[in-house]
From Swiss-Prot:
Gene: flgB
Location within or outside the cell: Bacterial flagellum basal body
Primary localization: other
Organism the protein comes from: Borreliella burgdorferi (strain ATCC 35210 / DSM 4680 / CIP 102532 / B31)
A GO CC term assigned to this protein in UniProt: bacterial-type flagellum basal body, rod
Keyword rRNA-binding: no
Family assignment from sequence similarity: Belongs to the flagella basal body rod proteins family.
GO biological processes: bacterial-type flagellum-dependent swarming motility
NCBIfam families according to UniProt: FlgB, PRK12622.1
Record InterPro entries: Flag_bb_rod_N, Flagellar_basal_body_rod_CS, FlgB
Keywords, ordered alphabetically: Bacterial flagellum
Name of protein: Flagellar basal body rod protein FlgB
Subunit structure: The basal body constitutes a major portion of the flagellar organelle and consists of a number of rings mounted on a central rod. In Gram-negative bacteria, at least four rings, L, P, S and M are present, whereas Gram-positive bacteria lack the L and P rings. The rod consists of about 26 subunits of FlgG in the distal portion, and FlgB, FlgC and FlgF build up the proximal portion of the rod with about 6 subunits each.
């Protein structure tokens, strides 16, 4: 996969993650008054960073004398990184057991919308470049 294809693929995947995050944040806000509701968030960037940092390193292939032995370390590719929904069980904001803080959710919502807008502009730039080359 060349750099251009990889960039388009990455931005497309990241737009999907941002869309999922938007849904989770909206769900948190919608349940702000629900007793014992625990907020969720999407975890993605930290694992993606690990995949990018380890991308150029060689896999560690070990020779096993038994099937019960551990196998070698395989580097995770960025395309294999999946977003995970994480529940926050450890904090409580309200007396009813709900832990949704409207200020932090609105802040996360705005940040997510700005990132989504940025990534759609990046996608548009990629395809404008293709259009210019094809003319």
């Amino acid at each position: 996969m060349n750099d251009f294809e990889r960039s388009v693929d990455f931005s497309h995947r990241y737009l999907d993650v941002l869309s999922l995050r938007q849904s989770v944040i909206s769900d948190n806000i919608a349940n702000i008054d629900t007793p014992n509701f625990k907020r969720s968030k999407i975890s993605f960037e930290s694992e993606l960073e690990k995949a990018f940092l380890n991308e150029d390193k060689n896999d560690l292939n070990l020779i096993k004398s038994s099937d019960k032995h551990l196998s070698g370390f395989k580097n995770l590719k960025y395309s294999d990184v999946k977003p995970h929904r994480v529940l926050d069980h450890f904090s409580t904001m309200n007396n009813n057991g709900n832990n949704v803080d409207i200020d932090s959710e609105v802040k996360a919502l705005v940040q997510n919308q700005m990132m989504y807008h940025l990534m759609t502009n990046v996608q548009a730039h990629y395809f404008k470049s293709i259009n210019i080359v094809l003319k």
